Swiss-Prot record:
Name of the top EC class for this enzyme: ligase
One of the record's GO molecular function terms: ATP binding
Similarity annotation: Belongs to the class-I aminoacyl-tRNA synthetase family.
Cell location: Cytoplasm
Lineage: Bacteria, Bacillati, Cyanobacteriota, Cyanophyceae, Synechococcales
Name of the protein in question: Leucine--tRNA ligase
Stored InterPro entries: aa-tRNA-synth_I_CS (IPR001412), aa-tRNA-synth_Ia (IPR002300), Leu-tRNA-ligase (IPR002302), Leu_tRNA-synth_edit (IPR025709), M/V/L/I-tRNA-synth_anticd-bd (IPR013155), Methionyl/Leucyl_tRNA_Synth (IPR015413), Rossmann-like_a/b/a_fold (IPR014729), tRNAsynth_Ia_anticodon-bd (IPR009080)
Catalytic activity: tRNA(Leu) + L-leucine + ATP = L-leucyl-tRNA(Leu) + AMP + diphosphate
Protein species of origin: Synechococcus sp. (strain JA-2-3B'a(2-13)) (Cyanobacteria bacterium Yellowstone B-Prime)
């Protein structure tokens, strides 16, 4: 064993050895096996790891390594979410085929992951852009199609009029311009493919109750995204006789509806618009088409709209009310039309005030809730300062007058629904904010949709025997002209599998979220080329026991994965309801960030590399002093830390220890070079402790076989000295605390703090030749193994340990060792600390007082005086009051 810790030398050595012996290979599950499936959200192969990756994967790796040492059969795989726009853009910008660019990046990132010492089963590696994977993605599409869950319809898309192509929402900036051409983006209607996720809305919502191992924040985000609303569907009739359906959560306020508002995209707009209003309506529709749904539905945005020229009849009171269109009403939610009750809805109130529409109050607030002006305005509440949305009683509402406002039994909403159903004017309905999933992408680098369009047979699914539908390689990518696949006539033209006529392939590719919505299932049987996975294997390994990833995936990826799992359950492919039992959303990694408050935009951020004096930072261009904050690492801020540099200088174990020690996993982590250095010093200290122990014992060979015998059960507790008992207590306290930190809330930071305490206790014990010291050294190395796997392996071998440290059993603590023989008693005089002394653990209060009186501290500070009062806190404190 070398006297000096050299992480680069030992880490590469052990990584090669682990690969050679298949240390991380997933074992076959046997009857009675305890399984544990640990999974990090797999990355997009951008080419370089960032510190966010390092944190995510290190967290999961510690969990996986700990579970293996506990005797679990562990599945801990890795793969690549490899389709997507960046590869296509790289092909356009650099003239590199997307596949070549992607696989180069995968090779580079795989090497980086291996250098971190991550215990992945690389034999199960999957790549979503590989035909042997996307064959099964296409097969899943066919299962959705057969189940009626995949369909095609016209839908609005972002259209770049310069590049003549469809843009994803992320490619449209805040001003509504294309990221590439700068052109104002238009909304166009194109035929698009959808997955009917709304068919599972009720299950997705109800089963959130099963996810007790998920953060409450994530469950709430999903609940809000699904957005269940209980209310009523009510039919209004226009004066022309057309039916206009609305969904409302407040049917009790129908008597206060003074106008209606339709979405600009509502199919009845054309029919209801009069000739006099046609030009104004057309202009307004064009304006609305240029705005995103987020912009349109912003609460603080000024309301806009235009009258159609038509009227509807309020079914509950036969009043004639005007029909408007406004972009704050979205076609995708409810029916695309609303009844407007301005006295009791703030958006409707602002709209009515702007356009001079009537405001009628139908809820009487509790006494004292309204201003005198509002009370005086009475029924025609044109002078209200804001909509009243609180409690009260119904007024001006016919059969509901006097009923208390609320959604509970016997309250206004329930009574209104019952009355509407009895009158045949409406019915109870449950609506969801969730919309069907638009999966079409007019892109090349994605999974082809396995559908053929036949002029005679219509939409024909590709036969399963013909899967996969391969992406053509001879494609020219320009970023212009719509779908690149549509330009390849030789690929597009195909015979209809049903009738044999000339037909055309679908040229859209699938949303990449589809590839990531089932990858965790494939890992259970990753090399199966006959079926997507064997049912017995997926049921044995799934659900995932611990899933780790960023909060940014709280909604879409996690919701889609839950949806896929439920569909595949209903198709008989698996037998569980939810894919992930426990979820950990790690915090961001933040870097020291410099900015000039006198500059704006991107120019205000000054890259850390340009700051010469971090203690007194100045702008290298202007000399102005810079402000310093911690912000999420990003290229734009120039505040990132390259993992490669950290590995080269300190090694993987130091990087892992810092990442785990600096902050609890769910909190943001502030990168600090001084703390990295601190972890490096700690590992050096442990190295020296083991080195000195081995040298003192005559070298590794003299210890071979002996270290494994120095187990707690072998220690003769009765013959131990006080120093040995104290050290043994520290050893078993460390085992207990580290085990609990790894088992419960993954408080890795406090677990590492316990390792430091144990190292300190070993250094201070002064009994290097004791068997208890040997037990402590052995325990320290075992406890370190999940956190710093390379140094733990090297030290374990130096101690003469058999096999790999990662194949050892996790140590268990001896409860008897935690019980102290003595207790420390604090001495106070008039409430001030004056000293302490050791007393037997079984000391009585009377004995404690007498021992305190005879102590050196009491003799010094009492100066012979007799205390007026003595306060004894058993086994803790004696306070002498003079």
């Amino acid at each position: 064993m070398d006297a000096r810790y050299n992480p680069q030398a030992i880490e590469s050595k052990w990584q090669a050895h682990w690969r050679e012996i298949g240390l991380d290979r997933t074992p076959e599950l046997k009857d009675g096996s305890r399984k544990f499936y640990a999974l990090s959200m797999f990355p997009y192969p951008s080419g370089n790891l960032h510190m966010g990756h390092v944190r995510n994967y290190t967290i999961t790796d510690v969990i996986a390594r700990h579970k293996r040492m506990q005797g679990y059969a562990v599945l801990h795989p890795m793969g690549w979410d490899a389709f997507g726009l960046p590869a296509e853009n790289a092909a356009i910008d650099r003239g590199i085929p997307p596949a070549k660019w992607t696989y180069q990046n995968i090779a580079q990132m795989r090497e980086q992951l291996q250098r971190l010492g991550l215990s992945y089963d690389w034999e199960r590696e999957i790549t979503t852009c590989a035909p042997d994977y996307y064959k099964w993605t296409q097969w899943l599409f066919l299962q959705f199609f057969k189940a009626g869950l995949a369909y095609q319809k016209e839908a609005p898309v972002n259209w770049d009029p310069v590049d003549q192509t469809v843009l994803a929402n992320e490619q449209v900036d805040a001003e509504g311009r294309s990221w590439r051409s700068g052109a104002l983006v238009e909304k166009r209607m194109l035929k698009q493919w959808f997955f009917k996720i709304t068919a599972y809305a009720d299950q997705l919502l109800a089963d959130l109750e099963k996810l007790s191992g998920w953060p409450e924040r994530v469950r709430t985000m999903q609940e809000n995204w699904i957005g269940q609303s209980v209310g009523a569907k009510v039919i209004f009739k226009t004066e022309a006789g057309d039916e206009l359906a609305v969904f409302t959560t407040r049917p009790d306020t129908l008597w206060g509806a003074t106008f209606m508002v339709m979405s600009p995209e509502h199919p009845l707009v054309d029919k209801l618009t009069t000739a006099e209003q046609l030009q104004a309506v057309r202009a307004y529709q064009a304006q609305a088409a240029a705005r995103s749904e987020i912009e349109r539905s912003a609460e603080d945005r000024e309301k806009t709209g235009v009258w159609t020229g038509s009227y509807a009849i309020n079914p509950v009171n036969q009043e004639r009310i005007p029909i408007w269109i406004a972009d704050y009403v979205l076609m995708g939610y409810g029916t695309g039309a609303i009844m407007a009750v301005p006295a009791h809805d703030q958006r409707d109130f602002e709209f009515a005030r702007k356009f001079g529409l009537p405001i009628k109050r139908v809820v009487q607030p509790p006494e004292g809730s309204l201003s005198s002006t509002d009370r005086a305005s009475g029924t025609e509440s044109s002078e209200l300062q804001a909509a009243w949305t609180g409690e009260g009683v119904m007024i001006n509402s016919g059969p509901l007058d006097g009923i208390p406002v609320g959604k509970g039994p016997g309250q206004s909403v329930e009574r209104a629904i019952a009355w509407l159903e009895a009158q045949g004017l409406g019915e109870k309905q449950i609506n969801y904010r969730l919309r069907d999933w638009l999966i079409s992408r007019q892109r090349y680098w994605g999974c082809p949709i396995p559908v053929i369009h036949c002029p005679h047979c219509g939409i024909v699914p590709v036969p399963e025997k013909d899967l996969p539908v391969l992406l053509p390689e001879d494609v020219e990518l320009t970023g212009r002209g719509g779908s690149p696949l549509a330009q390849l006539e030789d690929w597009v033209k195909v015979k209809c599998p049903t009738c044999g006529a000339e037909a055309r392939r679908e040229t859209d590719t699938m949303d990449t979220f589809i590839c990531s919505s089932w990858y965790f299932l494939r890992f259970s049987d990753a090399r199966n080329d006959r079926e997507i996975f064997r049912k017995d294997r997926v049921n044995a390994w799934l659900p995932v026991d611990q899933y780790v990833g960023g909060i940014e995936h709280a909604i879409l990826h996690l919701l889609y994965s839950r949806f896929f799992t439920k569909v595949l359950r209903d198709r008989g492919l698996l037998d569980f309801d939810e894919p992930f039992l426990r979820l950990l959303t790690q915090g961001m990694v933040q870097g020291r960030t410099y900015y000039n408050p006198n500059k704006s935009g991107k120019d205000r951020w000054i890259p850390a590399a340009l700051v010469k004096d971090p203690d007194n930072p100045t702008d290298p261009e202007t000399g102005e002093p810079l402000e310093v904050i911690y912000a999420t690492m990003s290229k734009s801020k120039g505040n990132g830390v390259d993992p490669e540099e950290v590995l080269a200088h300190y090694g993987a174990d130091t990087a892992r220890m810092f990442i785990l020690f600096k902050a609890p996993p769910e909190k943001d982590l502030e990168w600090d070079d001084a703390d990295v250095e601190g972890q490096f010093r700690f590992l050096n200290r442990v190295w020296r402790q083991v080195y000195e122990f081995v040298v003192r014992g005559g070298g590794t060979e003299s210890w071979r076989g002996r270290v494994s015998e120095l187990l707690p059960a072998k220690v003769e507790v009765g013959s131990l000295t006080k120093a040995e008992k104290d050290l043994r207590r520290a050893i078993h306290t460390a085992i207990k605390e580290v085990s609990e930190d790894l088992e419960n809330d993954y408080q890795f930071n406090t677990a590492i703090a316990e390792l430091m305490k144990l190292s300190n206790a070993l250094g201070e014990a002064g009994i290097p030749d004791s068997p208890v010291y040997a037990e402590g050294i052995r325990t320290l190395v075992l406890l370190m193994a999940p956190f710093a796997p390379h140094i733990a392996e090297e030290l374990w071998q130096a101690l003469g340990g058999a096999d790999s440290v990662h194949r050892q059993s996790w140590p268990s603590y001896d409860p008897a060792a935690l019980v102290a023989d003595t207790v420390t008693i604090v001495i106070q005089v008039n409430g001030k600390l004056r000293g302490s002394f050791e007393a037997p653990a079984e000391v009585t209060p009377e004995e404690q007082e007498q021992l305190a009186l005879r102590s050196e501290a009491a003799q010094k500070y009492l100066e012979g005086a007799t205390p007026k009062k003595v306060v004894v806190v058993p086994k803790k404190l004696v306070n002498f009051v003079l």
